[in-house]
Regions:
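Core catalytic lobe of class I
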Residues: 1-143, 148-151
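Short, conserved SAM-binding/catalytic segment
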Residues: 154-160
C-alpha cells in the first residue's frame, strides 16, 4: 500500500520481504536505497506484524516506510505512534490473497494526512486504502490494472 500525499511531498510504502529457496530477500532495503537515490528522506520505518500464523513460504510482517522530500518536525497529531503494529485482521476478499489491515491503513492515514488531503494508492488492490480514506474524511484516488481486482474494489467501495 503506497500512500501518496502530493501536497506534503510524502510517500508511505508498505512492503514485505520475500522468502525464496529457504532464504529471505529483504526488498525493503532496495526500496530505501532507491528512494534515497532520488532525494527522498526516510521519516519513519515501522513494522506491521500480521498475526502469529506460521507459513514457511510467507513472512508474517511488513515494513511500513514513510519518505519525504524535506523532513518536517511537525506532526499532524500529538498522539504517540508505535513503531510496531500487531494486527492480524487482514482479510482475504473473494479469492484475492492479499488483504491490508483496515486498522493499520487508518493509522497511517491519520498520522500522515489531514482532513481534506488527497490520498493516492497506485496499487489499489481490494480498495482498503480508499475505504480508510473515506472513513477519515480524506479524498482518494487509486489505480489497479487487474480488472477482477478492480471490480472487487468497486464492489467494496459501493457501500461507502
Amino acid at each position: 500500500m503506497p500512500l501518496v500525499n502530493p501536497r506534503k511531498n510524502l510517500i508511505s510504502i508498505c512492503i514485505t520481504d520475500r522468502k525464496s529457496d529457504g532464504t529471505i530477500y529483504e526488498k525493503h532495503i532496495d526500496v530505501i536505497r532507491t528512494m534515497e537515490k532520488n532525494n527522498w528522506k526516510i521519516k519513519t520505518h515501522k513494522i506491521w506484524v500480521k498475526g502469529l500464523g506460521i507459513n514457511m513460504f510467507r513472512l508474517n510482517y511488513m515494513h511500513i516506510m514513510t519518505f519525504m522530500k524535506k523532513l518536517s518536525k511537525v506532526n499532524l497529531t500529538k498522539e504517540f505512534k508505535p513503531d510496531i503494529f500487531v494486527d492480524d485482521k487482514s482479510t482475504k476478499y473473494e479469492n484475492y490473497g492479499y488483504g491490508m489491515s483496515l486498522d493499520v491503513c487508518e493509522l497511517l492515514i491519520k498520522e500522515h494526512t489531514a482532513i481534506g488531503d488527497i490520498v493516492y494508492d497506485p496499487f489499489m488492490g481490494s480498495g482498503t486504502t480508499a475505504i480508510a480514506s473515506i472513513k477519515n474524511c480524506r479524498n482518494y484516488f487509486g489505480s489497479e490494472i487487474d480488472e477482477k481486482v478492480k471490480k472487487l474494489a468497486e464492489n467494496r467501495l459501493s457501500s461507502y
